[in-house]
Amino acid sequence: LYEHRAELDDVLAHEIEVMHKRIADTKKIPAKEYAEYSRLTAEAYSVYVKAKNTNDFALFEPYLTKIVDFCRKQTVWLADEHAHGYDVLLDMYEPHYTREKYDRFFDALRTRLVPVVRRVTAKIAPVPAWATQNFPADKQRDFCEYLRDVMCFDKTRGIMKESEHPFTSGFGTDDVRITNHYYEDNIASSIFSVIHETGHATYEQQCDRSLNCTLSGGGASLGMHESQSRFYENVIGRSKAFWQAHYGKLQQTFPQQLDDVTLDEFVAYVNRSERSFVRTEADELTYPLHIMLRYEIEQKLIDGSLAVKDLPAYWNEKFTEYFGITPPTDTLGVLQDVHWAYGNFGYFPTYALGSAIASQLFAAM
C-alpha cells in the first residue's frame, strides 16, 4: 500500500506515510530499552513534581540523566539521510523543521529582541499592589469556567480539571480535556492559562471528525496547534476589546480586589512587559527568549556538551545573559516545566513557531 500511495487520496496517502515512518522508527528502537524508558518516564513525573515543589533538583537529576541518555540514543537509532542528532527529535514535533530552519528563525529574533527587552523592561513600573492581593482559588475557578464557556469550549465534548501544570489532551474531537492551575496571589496566571488551553481545545474540537482515531487527527502540527492557543491568549485575551466585554464580570467575581481598578489599568497590567522567571507567565515580548533558552540547552544536552548535573548552573548563567536577572531557586528556573520529565526534547521550539504564526494570522486578517 505504501508503494502505491500516490494512487490514493491525499488524506489516506498521508496516513500511510506517517504510519510507515512510525512503524519503521519503532522497529529501530530496542524493545527492552523502550520498555525501560516507558517505566522511567512514568515514574519521573511524580518525582519531578516533588522536586519542583521542594526546590530539589538533585532529586530529579538521576531520572533526567537517564531520560537524556535515551533521547541521545534515539537520535542514533532514528537518524536517516534527512535528519540526525537533535534534528531527529525536532522532527517528531514539527515535521521537516530542522536546526537550520530554527536557527535562522531564532537568530533573527535574538538579534532584535534581546536589546529591546533590556530597554523596555528597564523602565517598567512595579507590579501594582492590587495584582498581588489574595484571589481565592474557588473564585478564580468560577471566572475561568466563565471564560472557557465564553470562548465556545463545548462542555458536552470535554472537561476542565486542575493539575500542577496546565495542559490540553484528549481522544479526538469528542473528548478534549484541559487543566488549569490557580495561584491565589496571581489572578493573571490562571486567566491566561485557561484562555491558552481553550485555544488548543477549541481547535481540537473543530478538527474534521472523520480524522478521529487516525494519525492525521489532532491538528495540522504542533506549531499550528500552538498558534491557536497563542492567538487566543495574546491576540484576543490581551486586547482591550475583549476586556471591555468581560472585565465587569471579573469585577463582580472579585469586588473587594478590583472595584477601584479601572479597565484601562487592568488592560495595561496584563500587557506589561517584564523580565519574569516563569515561561508560562511571560509576556509576548519576552516569551521567545524563554524558548530560545530551552532550545539552546536541549541541543547541548543531546550532543553531550552539557551534563545534566551542570544544568541548573548553566540555566541560571544563560537566563542572566538573556534577561539580566537570575532565578532565585531551581523551582523558578530549571524545574519550572514538566516537558523534560516526559522526555519531550524538541517540543519547546514549536511554542515560538506558534507565536509567530499567530501574529501572521492576525496581520493577515
What spans do the regions from the language model cover?
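N-terminal helix-rich structural modules
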Residues: 1-65
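C-terminal substrate/ligand-recognition segments
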Residues: 343-363
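Contiguous, non-catalytic segments that form substrate-binding/exosite surfaces or channel walls
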Residues: 37-189
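Active-site metal-coordination segments of metallo-dependent hydrolases
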Residues: 214-226, 286, 345-351
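Long, amphipathic alpha-helical stalk/connector segments used for oligomerization, subunit docking
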Residues: 238-342
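Inter-helical turn/loop segments and adjacent helix faces that build the functional surface
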Residues: 50-58, 96, 119-130, 208-215, ...
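Acidic/His metal-coordination segments adjacent to aromatic residues that form catalytic metal sites
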Residues: 172-187, 210-214, 272-278, 334-343
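Active-site recognition of the HExxH zinc-binding catalytic motif
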Residues: 79, 178-184, 189-209, 226-233
